From Swiss-Prot:
Gene coding for it: Alpk1
UniProt keyword list: Cell projection, Cytoplasm, Cytoskeleton, Immunity, Innate immunity, Kinase, Serine/threonine-protein kinase, Transferase
Disruption of the gene: reported phenotype: Mice show defects in motor coordination. The cerebellar architecture, Purkinje cell morphology and electrophysiology of the Purkinje cells is apparently not affected. Mice display impaired ability to initiate an innate immune response in response to ADP-D-glycero-beta-D-manno-heptose (ADP-Heptose): mice injected with ADP-Heptose show no increase in cytokine production.
Family from the record: Belongs to the protein kinase superfamily. Alpha-type protein kinase family. ALPK subfamily.
Organism: Mus musculus (Mouse)
GO biological process: cilium assembly; cytoplasmic pattern recognition receptor signaling pathway; innate immune response; positive regulation of canonical NF-kappaB signal transduction; response to bacterium
Protein's name according to its UniProt entry: Alpha-protein kinase 1
Length: 1231
């Protein structure tokens, strides 16, 4: 009966019965009563006893027989999971029968009893729905704390950290109070608090806050030991988590933790090295839970990993290396022996742990004996198993999952055969660990006594603040009395920023319109009004982005419902920032998630939204670009031309006029096809001409994350500068050739022109630089140098959005016309739109822009400064005064070469139309090493592929890791050494998805400034199906053996435009630096009793390997589910309507002061709570630093000037409370 589909089907049926009973309550039939009695009688006596005790609320967690006993009899050594598994079918039948007779107390007890077992089967979401249904039907039904905490665990696994934090903090603050549950004694409340503290520690571990996580796990151990009978299971779990944290913790943090006067763990005193302490902790953890195989497996896996890592470290004496490797070998073998060959494994967590043990053992054999045939065979088997595990996780049917589970365990058995795993003698046949592990059980775990309640008091500020942020009453209370103390219950789910109370939301999801009305009628008027306001605020988002309202299910985002046109969002004012974030609002796909959109058929939005009539320009433009018949294009283009004169497609004169999907998603570059100065208006999809030159209408379509230029509905050619589609593969070889694409189009007079794209691009007078300007791009880049010819060409070609006269405003107040392109490219202060990108310094998109001239040799030249103009930063403006903070700027983060293109976009203030032409022969020049601008733009600035004289063989040698390289990486290397070692590795092609790879996991510690590697296996899965398209990178699911959370979800990111390895490592180093700064910032907030904490999601690197040769590189971070918002970019734009922005700007100010005036963290984006307080999770920062000028998004001095004079023009309350010192204008100009 342990079939997931069958279990899920019965639970779904139970939920449907509860939904019907919620609408009407019929009399209980005699047949139903008889069935209920029959089902109860069919249960084994042990299960009947457990159900009775659960109804009586005898314990908050279903206990194991051995959990609280020191002396055990043979019957105490059984595993409760085996008992539940054997009677699962009868329990499910009893659950359904209890619901039919409306015995919610009995049904709730059965849910409680099955909870842990079904969590192992990966069907907790369905069971939690039943628990909520029971509570909705009869709010007085007691729901066990274990079930409420399960909700928190599932939330952590699925990425809903805000929700999990609320549930846990509420239980801790309210002494475990939840709904109508009654505790039998005070020690049960301590147990619940200890478990909650433990899970909070796991959340901080997930966020990479190693020291803080270790403190919480230590606190949970204190709680378990405070009980009248110590909880051996809880202690075992906490010791295992603590050991896992020690693996990632720096030596500095470990020494600090070890020497802390309040931390009194005995094992810390016995070992000097954190990895040896971790290994010993795992040995104890396995011994404490010797009768539960999964607990033993997890503990010995961590022990083996610790010993393996220590054997590779520089601290391990050479003579002890083989000793520790043998101890690691023993640990992994113990784990593999927790299941017999042919024994069924049902859950993802256990399967993952077995593969990890097999891989760990393979790695140990490799270190001890080298790359033998057995090692190579075992490694291949582990890789196959990881691939099957990913398929297992995503398989829709239980039959497939059961077959895959058997195949995975068969592969594990083969690994055991290749590596000759033998069973060990054991006196206790029920125990899964050898007798040698049990000798440490008698030793003291703690020195001295610590008061658990005092420990909780130190965290009370955090728990209270989280509860205040999400304060709500039970959604089912008929009186909804607001003066009663708020306690978490199974339906109190108001913890997401983009949904209303999910009690109502979940009910709406499963019921008809009538049922929704009925449920709504049960709410108070105040709650109904509140719900309406919430719906009103989120209406725009809900049309374009639909997320599962059942916040307990591990669901991905659903596709948008295009049946409503997809353009309802366009009817909102540009200034209406409460309904959705501005950069998502303009596109019609409101941003509710951080990951970049792939596989997005934007044309569907355009086609189905083209019927809108409220804004004729948008509707007409949409049709013209996407699906207008050829015969109508000429007249349509004339109409659009007249409509678009004087109108900026980025910022309109009418606040209520918003850009169409085609304008924002189908941005076509202005393509001069020949020397006749023809240019294409990107937003309108038409060509404005001069001197009677031919005109061409182009359209741009997006499919699977790649852009394609469409000349007609059937004639297309692909823009090869963007990432290829999922189905297509990058050109083979180290450097792929640029394919020659045929084009075929007709001008407006019906004359057909043909040729190759390469011929067009490399014409005698103009170089074709195909790239689209995406207002939702991520980050702008910067260099101190001027512009390369191709980059100037790219920027100039992208700029003509409104066909208006271009002028350049300089800090000294001078104005220069843009048609001076014969000698260079002048740029100006852009009138900005709400999608402000993070820009690069090269083109200087914003106020302090410089003219870049190009010499005859094709080299870029920075313009000469005018007299009186400072090179340090802008000091004066056109109107003679510093502008106020800009709120309407392009809001995404801009990359190198994009800033210039954005700068050259039309100004809203332009009053006349004047097309301009690029005639400089410099634009047709190739790069100095013979590359065309096309191929230069198709790679990174730092692409080693363009280095003259570098051969493929040299690149291949640089990518191959020698044994000495691997040894150093495993021991830990500094950032500069790593970058130097990877310097000549060239530009890697895109990673191959849908398969498993060998990999090196590299973690960076800002405190030690070391990168430490770990061998692993990773499966690169499907692209994320999300609604926010990123400019730079694609995001896809990954699952790797050494991820922090076995059941957690992780996302990999790779650049769409292939780049060198330096970019990936610099990105992670920057994010972990921001995390280091924010940790110190949080301490200052806590000291001042400010109820907010900011976290940066940790990021790591996975180097994809094939026989020790680097084949790819991705960055990886935990998946966070919730509403994704962007608070600022890396130049001047900031969204002050979010309360979180106040804290973010204060954090940026703090980072400047904490770094001794050298760094400012900017480009704030992530997940915030509804009121912007409590908890803020951020990702993908940029840092303006005076030290690292090799990063193109780092503006250095000018970036710091932007921050203090535009984004953070005056200090806020947080700055004052933290006593931050504000630099003067002169200081920021001379940083």
């Amino acid at each position: 009966m342990n079939n997931q589909d069958a279990v899920a089907s019965i639970l779904h049926e139970c939920k449907q019965v509860l939904d019907r009973l919620l609408l009407e309550t019929p009399d209980v039939s005699t047949e139903d009563k008889s069935e209920d009695q029959r089902c109860r009688a069919s249960l084994p006596s042990e299960l009947r006893t457990l159900i009775q005790e659960a109804e009586e609320m005898k314990w908050p967690f279903v206990p194991e027989k051995w959990q609280y006993k020191q002396a055990m009899s043979p019957e105490d050594k059984t595993n409760l999971q085996d008992v539940i598994g054997a009677g699962l079918q009868q329990l499910l039948a009893a659950l359904r029968a209890s619901i039919l007779v409306q015995d919610c107390a009995a049904a709730s007890a059965i849910v409680f009893l099955m909870d842990r077992f079904l969590y192992g089967l990966d069907v907790s979401g369905k069971l939690l729905q039943v628990a909520k249904g029971l509570h909705k039907l009869k709010p007085a039904t007691p729901i066990a704390p274990q079930v409420v905490i399960r909700q928190a665990r599932v939330s952590v696994n699925s990425g809903k950290l805000l929700k999990a934090e609320y549930i846990l903090s509420s239980l801790i603050s309210n002494n475990g109070a939840t709904g109508t549950w009654l505790y039998r004694n005070e020690s049960d409340k301590v147990l619940v608090q200890s478990v909650c503290i433990q899970i909070r520690g796991q959340i901080l571990q997930k966020l990479g806050m190693w020291y803080e996580a270790a403190e919480l796990i230590w606190a949970s151990v204190i709680g378990y030991l405070t009980l009248p009978q110590p909880d051996k299971k809880g202690i075992s779990t906490s010791l295992g988590i603590l050991a896992d944290i020690f693996v990632s913790m720096s030596k500095t943090d470990y020494e600090k933790f070890k020497k802390s006067p309040k931390v009194n763990l005995a094992l810390l005193k016995e070992f000097d090295h954190h990895l040896l302490s971790a290994a010993e902790a795992c040995k104890l953890a396995a011994a404490f839970s010797a009768y539960t195989p999964l607990f033993v497996l997890r503990a010995v896996n961590i022990r083996g990993t610790c010993l393996l890592s220590y054997s590779c470290s520089a601290d391990c004496p050479p003579g002890m290396k083989s000793v520790h490797l043998c101890e690691a070998k023993e640990a992994f073998e113990i784990g593999l022996l927790t299941k017999k060959d042919g024994e069924l494994v049902s859950g993802k967590q256990e399967l993952h742990s077995f593969i990890k043990a097999a891989f760990g053992l393979t790695t140990v054999h490799s270190r001890l004996h080298g790359e033998t045939d057995a090692v190579r065979a075992a490694r291949q088997l582990c890789s196959e198993a990881v691939g099957k595990l990913y398929t297992f996780s995503t398989s829709p049917t239980s039959q497939d999952r059961e077959g895959l589970s058997q195949e995975i365990m068969s592969l594990i058995s083969q690994v055991k055969g290749h590596l000759r795993v033998q069973s060990f003698p054991n006196l206790d046949v029920c125990s899964y660990v050898p007798e040698s592990f049990k000798c440490g059980l008698d030793r003291l775990i703690l020195h001295g006594h610590v008061d658990f309640q005092q420990i909780l008091e130190t965290y009370s500020q955090h728990h209270t603040s989280v509860c205040e942020v999400f304060e709500s009453t039970c959604g089912n209370s008929k009186s909804n009395q607001r003066d009663t103390k708020s306690e978490v219950c199974i339906t109190t789910l108001k913890t997401e920023t983009n949904t209303a109370d999910t009690m109502v939301a979940t009910l709406e999801r499963v019921s008809s319109q009538d049922s929704r009305s009925t449920a709504s009628s049960k709410m108070s008027k105040k709650d109904q009004g509140k719900l309406q306001r919430e719906r009103g605020r989120s209406w725009t988002r809900s049309k374009a982005f639909r997320v599962s309202l059942d916040l307990d299910m591990e669901t991905e985002t659903e596709p948008p419902n295009h049946s409503n046109g997809g353009t309802d969002v366009f009817n909102k004012s540009l200034r209406d920032n409460s309904s959705s974030c501005s950069w998502g609002r303009l596109s019609g796909l409101s941003s509710s998630t951080s990951w970049e959109e792939v596989n997005c058929a934007v044309q569907d939005v355009v086609r189905k939204g083209s019927g809108q009539e409220k804004h004729p320009v948008e509707a007409q433009s949409s049709e013209a670009v996407s699906e207008e018949p050829k015969r109508n294009r000429s007249s349509r283009a004339v109409f659009l031309s007249s409509k678009l004169r004087g109108v900026s497609l980025q910022t309109t004169g009418d606040d209520n006029l918003e850009s169409s999907p085609s304008q924002l998603h189908n941005h076509t570059s202005i393509l001069p096809f020949n020397a006749k100065d023809t240019c294409l208006a990107s937003g309108a999809g038409l060509v404005e001409t001069a001197e009677g030159s031919n005109n061409t209408s182009l359209q741009s379509s997006h499919s699977c994350g790649s852009d394609s230029w469409s000349l007609s509905s059937s004639d297309r050619f692909t823009d090869v500068t963007t990432n290829p589609s999922v189905q297509e593969e990058e050109p083979s070889g180290i450097m792929g050739d640029v394919p020659e694409s045929k084009y075929d189009f007709k001008d407006w007079h019906g004359e057909k022109n043909g040729g190759t794209l390469t011929e067009i691009c490399t014409g005698p007078e103009l170089t074709f630089a195909p790239s689209s300007v995406d207002p939702e791009g991520e980050t702008a880049e910067s260099t101190d140098d001027g512009l390369s010819p191709s980059q100037v060409a790219l920027g100039c070609l992208e700029g003509s959005h409104s066909m208006s006269t271009r002028r350049t405003f300089f800090p000294d107040g001078s104005v220069q016309n843009a048609d001076s392109a014969k000698t260079g490219c002048s740029v100006r202060d852009q009138t900005v739109d709400p999608d402000a990108s993070t820009v690069d310094e090269e083109g200087q998109m914003l106020d302090s822009t410089e003219v870049c001239s190009i010499g005859q040799d094709g080299a870029h030249r920075p313009r000469a400064l005018r007299s009186g103009q400072s090179a340090e930063g802008p000091k004066s403006f056109v109107n003679g005064s510093r502008p106020s903070p800009i709120f309407d700027e392009d809001f995404s983060t801009t990359e190198e070469g994009e800033e210039l293109g954005s700068m050259l976009k039309s100004s809203q203030n332009s009053s006349s139309y004047s097309p301009w032409w690029l005639k400089s022969p410099a634009f047709s020049r190739s790069s100095s090493d013979g590359e065309s601008s096309w191929s230069l733009l198709n790679s990174s600035r730092s692409s080693f592929a363009s280095l003259a004289g570098q051969t493929s063989q040299e690149i291949l040698e640089a990518r191959t890791l020698q044994p000495d390289d691997l040894e150093k990486l495993l021991a830990g290397v500094r950032h500069d050494w790593l970058l130097q070692r990877l310097e000549n590795t060239g530009v890697l092609k895109s990673n191959q998805l849908q398969q498993a790879h060998s990999a090196l996991l590299l973690k960076y510690s800002k405190k030690s400034e070391l990168w430490t590697a770990q061998e692993t296996v990773v499966y690169l899965g499907d692209y994320l199906k999300v609604k926010k398209k990123g400019k730079q990178r694609n995001a896809f699911w990954v699952h790797y053996l050494h991820q922090e959370e076995t059941l957690g979800r992780y996302v990999g990111k790779e650049y769409k435009e292939r780049k060198g390895l330096r970019h990936h490592f610099t990105d992670v180093e920057r994010q972990m630096t921001a995390q280091h700064y924010v940790t110190e910032f949080n301490k200052r907030l806590y000291e001042q009793k400010i109820p907010t904490q900011i976290f940066y999601v940790p990021s790591t690197i996975l180097l994809i390997l094939e026989d020790r040769t680097i084949k790819g590189c991705i960055s990886v971070e935990p998946y966070i589910l919730g509403e994704f918002v962007k608070l600022s970019n890396n130049t001047k734009v900031v969204k002050n309507e979010y309360k979180a922005t106040e804290y973010g700007l204060a954090y940026g100010h703090f980072s400047y002061e904490f770094s001794n005036h050298r760094d400012v963290v900017v480009d704030l984006q992530g997940w915030v709570t509804g009121n912007g307080k409590g908890l803020i999770y951020l990702t993908d920062p940029q840092i303006h630093s005076v030290d690292q000028k090799d990063v193109t998004t780092n503006f250095g001095k000018r970036g710091i000037f932007y921050f203090f004079n535009n984004q953070h023009a005056s200090c806020n309350e947080i700055c004052h409370r933290l006593s931050l010192t504000r630099p003067s204008l002169e200081q920021t100009s001379k940083v």
